[in-house]
Amino acid sequence: ISACLVGSEMCIRDSADTLRGHFVDGRIVLDERRLSDEDLRQIEKIFVVACGSAYHSGLLAKYAIEHWTRVPVEIELASEFRYRDPVLGPNTLVVAISQSGETADTLEAVRHARSQKARVLAVCNTNGAQIPRESDAVLYTHAGPEIAVASTKAFLAQVIANYLVGLALAQARGTKYPDEVAVIYRELEAMAEKVERVLDQTDDIRSIGRQFAGSNTLLFIGRNVGYPVALEGALKLKELAYIHAEGFAAGELKHGPIALIDEGMPVVVIMPSPKGRAVLHSKMISNVKEVQARGATTIVIAEDNDEAAVSYTHLRAHETGRN
């Protein structure tokens, strides 16, 4: 597990560049945009297409974009998108997420969307790549080269960029006031410092990793935005530590996954904030007790002000803004 930390500090610290230059005179600005505010106001449905970690960043985007814009969002694996004949048209926006901008399945999804007259907005890290060239608008993540074997800083940069897309849509559609957009943008700016504070716990994280280095299987569970984070955590463990791992929505444990839990199995719990998420937080505490009763060893990742989870918590994250 501790292998997951190799190079992560260097990679993640660069993600703050994603925000640079995207908030000018109180407005969200995209890098290359051939979509007017009027075009964005006409959007009736949004598809997010991506693969791997980019797909998980899209799952996170769904929560924010729907909340901020009240436009329905579907998340699709790019490799499946064009084969199921999705309903697309001029009032559909397809957000294509790709670190390289050359992901073959995502590129084909973009081409299919364009053939159906849908609008396409690319979220990409590589200037001049094929996907942004074939899209109507582009938001570059400016995360620099991805050095790690697995996507680390690219994932965080994509999450931030997707939130910027949501804010740009909300701004154009008038579903968020300018001062609300500014507040959320400032909270995104503060993310870099909060990531730094988590990285300051590297020694503790390595210690936890060493405790479970002999494990053959880990489960990750989360609710709401914690569910995509659980999926991403499991993917990272598979890619970097070569350990079998699966991510699940915590509410689905009783529908099958709990049968996998046996004595000593590590279960990583993404604990929601107790602020404004009291119901979800209470349910996650119940999930922790549920897996512990079946012999699991829990690794709970929680906010540093979460007193209710303190007896279960090994790693504390830092409070984030809620909008």
Model-derived features with residue positions:
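Single conserved hydrophobic/aromatic residue that forms the stacking wall/gate
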Residues: 1-7, 314-317, 321-323
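Glycine-rich phosphate-binding loops that contact phosphosugars or nucleotide phosphates
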Residues: 3, 41-190, 271-278, 282-312
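Active-site phosphate/pyrophosphate-binding segments
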Residues: 13, 17-47, 116, 127, ...
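Gly/Ser/Thr-rich helix-start
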Residues: 51-53, 59, 102, 223-225, ...
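Histidine-centered active-site/metal-ligand motif
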Residues: 56, 244, 255, 314, ...
